[in-house]
A protein has these predicted regions:
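N-terminal small-residue-enriched
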Residues: 2-101
Length: 101
């Protein structure tokens, strides 16, 4: 397996995300799967970031299983959360109570 920075954890080889093991600031440089990436935004401890580019509509995979679909293109190293990840199983709502599909 290619080199990956110890500040992130890859949970399963087929995952297209990894998990931050510590708070990561915007502009942090990491090596993920042998590729050098600069984080476009901060990622809190325990949260997800993209291991590679993820296309809009593509399944986001964690623990080797799909956890939802990308609502928009997600670049490698980008923070993956409710702003760009939608559930395929239940409606996703914004803070004002509007459904976001």
């Amino acid at each position: 397996m290619p080199e990956t920075d110890r500040r992130v954890l890859v949970l399963a080889p087929e995952d297209n995300i990894c998990v931050a093991c510590q708070d990561l600031d915007a502009d942090t440089e990491l090596v993920i799967d042998g590729a050098q990436l600069r984080l476009p935004q901060a990622v809190p401890t325990g949260h997800k970031l993209a291991r590679r580019d993820i296309a809009a509509g593509e399944k986001v995979v964690k623990y080797g299983a799909p956890i939802g679909s990308a609502r928009q293109p997600i670049g490698a190293g980008a923070y993956v959360h409710t702003h760009n990840l939608g559930s395929d199983y239940i409606p996703t709502w914004d803070r004002e109570g509007r459904e976001m599909r």
